[in-house]
């Protein structure tokens, strides 16, 4: 590669780090950035910088927030007897779009995956267990219906059941091997309504 395209190659490499983005997609995004005005490109860079410096994990549910506690955890209108456990903050947005769930959430920030060297100790499991008190009556396992999602849900259910708290799993409507993030509102609604006890 000629020396003068090194910054472009670096940009392509950085975009290529995103999950699901291959070389072609990364190249397309890099050229889109190059086609932006300087003001637009700087606004994008600043938005990334602000998100990384101003957002952190909610001390209760582990979702991203600018404050100490996120809006959902702080809301007195939420049902505090139900906690929905999700893999990532993106999954909260997917479930919230259904307008059918009014409980609280807990973000694990990953799934148990021995093949990838990810164990329960690398997830926000101890934070979840610390939240389980006499107020909580049900924990919904809303992890993706993949091998890792199922393993994580079963692991958590084994930890929670002895506490006398009902543990349920999202049911039909979610195809096996898919990601919760890509499910539409109707599919998620049916899965929430048809959840089963673990």
Language model region names:
Residues 3, 36, 40, 116-120, ...:
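Catalytic cores of large soluble enzymes that bind and process phosphate-bearing ligands
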Residues 2-8, 17, 27-92:
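Cys/His-rich Zn2+-binding cysteine-cluster or related metal-binding knuckle/ribbon modules and their
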Residues 14, 18, 36, 51-54, ...:
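Conserved, well-folded catalytic cores of nucleic-acid-processing
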Residues 26, 75-143:
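Extended interfacial segments that mediate partner engagement and assembly in macromolecular machines
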């Amino acid at each position: 590669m000629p020396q003068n395209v090194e910054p472009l190659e670096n940009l392509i490499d950085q975009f290529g780090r995103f999950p699901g983005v291959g070389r072609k997609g990364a190249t397309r995004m890099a050229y889109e950035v190059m086609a932006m005005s300087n003001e637009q490109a700087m606004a994008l860079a600043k938005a990334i910088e602000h998100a990384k410096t101003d957002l952190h994990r909610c001390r209760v549910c582990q979702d991203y927030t600018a404050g100490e506690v996120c809006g959902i955890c702080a809301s007195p209108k939420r049902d505090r007897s139900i906690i929905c456990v999700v893999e990532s903050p993106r999954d909260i947005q997917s479930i919230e779009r259904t307008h059918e769930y009014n409980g609280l959430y807990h973000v694990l920030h990953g799934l148990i995956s021995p093949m990838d060297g990810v164990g329960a100790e690398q997830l926000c499991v101890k934070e979840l267990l610390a939240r389980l008190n006499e107020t909580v009556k049900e924990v919904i396992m809303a992890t993706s219906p993949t091998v890792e999602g199922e393993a994580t849900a079963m692991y958590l259910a084994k930890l929670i059941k002895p506490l006398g708290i009902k543990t349920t799993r999202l049911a039909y409507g979610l195809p096996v091997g898919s990601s919760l993030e890509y499910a539409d509102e109707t599919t998620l609604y049916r899965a929430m309504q048809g959840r089963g006890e673990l």
